[in-house]
Amino acid sequence: MHCLFLCFLSITAALGSIPELPARSCWEIKASEGEDTISKKYWLDQLGTREYVFEVFCDQKTSSGGCTVFQRRVDGSVDFFLDWTDYKHGFGNLSGEFWLGLEKIHRLTSDHNNVRRVDLEDFEGNTAYAEYNMFGVMSRENKYKLILGAYSGKKKCSACKESGGGKISKVEGTQILLR
């Protein structure tokens, strides 16, 4: 099982920096590099075909590492009140605040063999997390339907429904609305 964190990512980078053989997942990077693997930006080629290579931020510490961060909000420096196209393709910067993009998240989670973990921290430093033992986002044709398994953790995602999930219908401000 791979874990995918709710965090954001940069969708632009120089093509010259793509490694010859990008890994298929942050988990594969962690497994090959071991305990000293650093949390940073990496190139992924999820299908191993070099047809759809993109950059992600891999968290190599939380939950034993190997986690792909797909959304991060820290200081409000990135506007999240954007349209559907931005949420489909992604926006922001992997080094700061970002959203990976529904199409990339779908490609990374299409086998549903992933764990979804949401880590939260308030202004007083209080933390909580929610973890689902299965996570996937279906294709555009299926309106990026959210697939979630059983919940564990300190904070349940109030917008998410276990098992059936929901189809993403529109984006309002910083929330993705499910139906």
Model regions and ranges:
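Mature extracellular or lumenal effector domains of secreted proteins
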Residues: 2-179
